[in-house]
Amino acid sequence: MSFSVEVLAGIAIELQRGIGHQDRFQRLITTLRQVLACDASALLRYESRQFIPLAIDGLAQDVLGRRFTLEGHPRLEAIARAGDVVRFPADSDLPDPYDGLIPGQESLKVHACVGLPLFAGQNLIGALTLDAMTPEQFEVFSDEELRLVAALAAGALSNALLIEQLESQNILPGSSGVFEPIKETHMIGLSPAMTQLKKEIEIVAGSDLNVLIGGETGTGKELVAKAIHQGSPRAVNPLVYLNCAALPESVAESELFGHVKGAFTGAISNRSGKFEMADNGTLFLDEIGELSLALQAKLLRVLQYGDIQRVGDDRSLRVDVRVLAATNRDLREEVLAGRFRADLFHRLSVFPLFVPPLRERGDDVVLLAGYFCEQCRLRLGLSRVVLSTGARRHLLNYGWPGNVRELEHAIHRAVVLARATRAGDEVILEAQHFALSEDVLPAPPAESFLALPTCRNLRESTENFQREMIRQALAQNNHNWAASARALETDVANLHRLAKRLGLKD
């Protein structure tokens, strides 16, 4: 069998039929799999010495979330270096990146593999990979025929990336206009909620507006901030991060605005604050809702007038900083409760974004699981880490109250458990490797901590009672001090001070 003119014309037509790049890519690889009668096909994008799957057919869904580094995958490195069609023999010693990732064939290894590097001019922009369980599957197709397929795919991918680059304003007035791949931000997800979020990020990134990023703990608000910064004209300048929840009130002002020598005990030299560090760049204020009202007023002044004062200094400094703020609180409710300034809220929320919880992202769970599996594989030096069908189903059926962060920890824990029970450097994750159901959480103690303390005096009893309340709040909030302070209805700085006095922290 070989390609006829009709077959090639059919592939070209399929590339024009799709609505949007993703649909065209999917049509391309689905058609190729049918024409070549192979078990799996994939279109990959090349970026920063790694291949990123754009569309797959015949492979496990979590492949779309994986990032295949050249260092970790010698076959893909060979494809990247070759510059032409690469055929791997069935007895090749090089491991196939898709071993264990063909549904129903998790325990079997791929036999036949062909790689087609894709170029835009002299630049490598991606690859097509074709895999089959039958060793001689691709022998009937000549290299010339496969080069024609690669040329069609390269044209489609090159056009798509160039359009994406223009839409994201990565080619700005005065730039050379030379094609450059867009940087990966690890915002993995194809669900409608994530697709909408990515569109909103593209819209606001090129502006200089302040952005308020809302969402539950663990959803990836910091990644959103990085994506906004990378897509902005300020990307060549620093993105400075500050977690407001981890700031004791006594040093918060100094952290934000800096201080001069002698401003307070311990100020032995002048020190720049985060605003100065972020000058001409971006400042990301995580957990903005934890700032005291006094600091909120000073932050508002910076946003209004663009000048700061170091602690202990009468002079003002001009700064040009874009502020991105994140919170897991409902700041509208905080404003109504008097805990957050209404004027600051309106200054920050010029363009609000909401990061959806993982439970609302559908099959994105599997894509993210694939990404974390690949990270674990590289970190632990394993040849492969794959999810069984049962494990994928198990992950999809769980509610993920801790969102993406909980999924990451669950995958890492499962890999360690599976590795301990299986010899060799190959890990297949099964449902039993994940302890996700609520019934596996430790049961609360039979005796309530509200029981009457058996101490000799009122002060000792009160302190023991306070210690137990703080311990319980920390345990119930994953040792997050800000969340624990909210649960106890106290200020986080006061909670830190009380914990120190009670001997609960250094």
Curated annotation (Swiss-Prot):
<dbReference type="InterPro" id="IPR003018">
    <property type="entry name" value="GAF"/>
</dbReference>
<dbReference type="InterPro" id="IPR009057">
    <property type="entry name" value="Homeodomain-like_sf"/>
</dbReference>
<dbReference type="InterPro" id="IPR025944">
    <property type="entry name" value="Sigma_54_int_dom_CS"/>
</dbReference>
<feature type="binding site">
    <location>
        <begin position="215"/>
        <end position="222"/>
    </location>
    <ligand>
        <name>ATP</name>
    </ligand>
</feature>
<comment type="pathway">
    <text>Nitrogen metabolism; nitric oxide reduction.</text>
</comment>
<keyword id="KW-0238">DNA-binding</keyword>
<keyword id="KW-0067">ATP-binding</keyword>
<dbReference type="GO" id="GO:0005524">
    <property type="term" value="F:ATP binding"/>
</dbReference>
<keyword id="KW-0597">Phosphoprotein</keyword>
<dbReference type="InterPro" id="IPR023944">
    <property type="entry name" value="NorR"/>
</dbReference>
<dbReference type="GO" id="GO:0000160">
    <property type="term" value="P:phosphorelay signal transduction system"/>
</dbReference>
<dbReference type="InterPro" id="IPR027417">
    <property type="entry name" value="P-loop_NTPase"/>
</dbReference>
<feature type="DNA-binding region" description="H-T-H motif">
    <location>
        <begin position="481"/>
        <end position="500"/>
    </location>
</feature>
<dbReference type="InterPro" id="IPR025943">
    <property type="entry name" value="Sigma_54_int_dom_ATP-bd_2"/>
</dbReference>
<keyword id="KW-0547">Nucleotide-binding</keyword>
<feature type="binding site">
    <location>
        <begin position="278"/>
        <end position="287"/>
    </location>
    <ligand>
        <name>ATP</name>
    </ligand>
</feature>
<dbReference type="InterPro" id="IPR003593">
    <property type="entry name" value="AAA+_ATPase"/>
</dbReference>
<dbReference type="GO" id="GO:0003700">
    <property type="term" value="F:DNA-binding transcription factor activity"/>
</dbReference>
<dbReference type="Pfam" id="PF01590">
    <property type="entry name" value="GAF"/>
</dbReference>
<keyword id="KW-0804">Transcription</keyword>
<dbReference type="InterPro" id="IPR002078">
    <property type="entry name" value="Sigma_54_int"/>
</dbReference>
<dbReference type="GO" id="GO:0016887">
    <property type="term" value="F:ATP hydrolysis activity"/>
</dbReference>
<feature type="modified residue" description="4-aspartylphosphate">
    <location>
        <position position="57"/>
    </location>
</feature>
<feature type="domain" description="Sigma-54 factor interaction">
    <location>
        <begin position="187"/>
        <end position="416"/>
    </location>
</feature>
<dbReference type="InterPro" id="IPR029016">
    <property type="entry name" value="GAF-like_dom_sf"/>
</dbReference>
<dbReference type="GO" id="GO:0003677">
    <property type="term" value="F:DNA binding"/>
</dbReference>
<dbReference type="Pfam" id="PF00158">
    <property type="entry name" value="Sigma54_activat"/>
</dbReference>
<dbReference type="InterPro" id="IPR025662">
    <property type="entry name" value="Sigma_54_int_dom_ATP-bd_1"/>
</dbReference>
<protein>
    <recommendedName>
        <fullName>Anaerobic nitric oxide reductase transcription regulator NorR</fullName>
    </recommendedName>
</protein>
<keyword id="KW-0805">Transcription regulation</keyword>
<comment type="function">
    <text>Required for the expression of anaerobic nitric oxide (NO) reductase, acts as a transcriptional activator for at least the norVW operon. Activation also requires sigma-54.</text>
</comment>
